[in-house]
């Protein structure tokens, strides 16, 4: 019997390789997560929450952030990919950074291979989450039965379309009910980090409230440069250049000193212990960054 079992296992392995496991189905957990450029004290947030609860009173609504820089789709894409993976499968993300609201740009739901749904304008906001989690299907939001029942505004699709559709998905409405399938999404032409000739090049993704500068250069890029803890790193951001040590924590350098760390999502962060590097160098989102091992 042993040879027979071996043959069975062999062919089972071949089948698994030829037919990989399917992507996870979207199974809603009731969570609806909001990311917008509406601002932290805007009445728009209360209104969109009302639209969600009107459609699905049992929804669990939370904010990823409402402080995306106004109209900044690229910043929104970076923030979304940095945080989304911390949420459980079955989460609905409503993402609204929409300077083209009311124009012919499409409204979509993107279902990813790991069981998330992202609802919002098709303007590039989902570029990085699509790359990271994979696309299972894309639907255009044309089914008006899922929209707000009252007249639809041309300037508040968050209330009239995205909130109600996101709530519907969280309540168990199938993704396929949202509208017709699309073949692709609009993607931003984003600069990825690159390692060449002993230099990692990238861009500033964001600065945080402490003035730390987070880049899109990764810990893997540092390993490619053979940079280890305690090594000195030559950093250039925009027109500013300096050398700082690579540390695990901020407190490993004296107060007011610069350092480089790998932040919680695996990106290279440049900082000042108990100070604001962003204020010191006057560089922010989109600034060019290079790092190399200091000689």
Model-derived features: positions:
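Sec/Tat signal peptide C-region and signal peptidase I cleavage site
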Residues: 19-23
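Structural motif
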Residues: 30-33, 59-62, 91-94, 107-109, ...
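A conserved acidic, glycine/proline-rich C-terminal tail/linker
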Residues: 216-281
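Bacterial N-terminal signal peptides
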Residues: 7-18
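Anionic-ligand-binding alpha/beta catalytic cores of soluble enzymes and soluble regulatory domains
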Residues: 151-217, 221, 226-227
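Surface-exposed interaction regions enriched in Ser/Thr/Asp/Glu
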Residues: 285-294
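Active-site histidine-anchored catalytic micro-motif
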Residues: 29-31, 43, 55-61, 67, ...
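Positively charged n-region of N-terminal signal peptides that target proteins for export
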Residues: 1-6
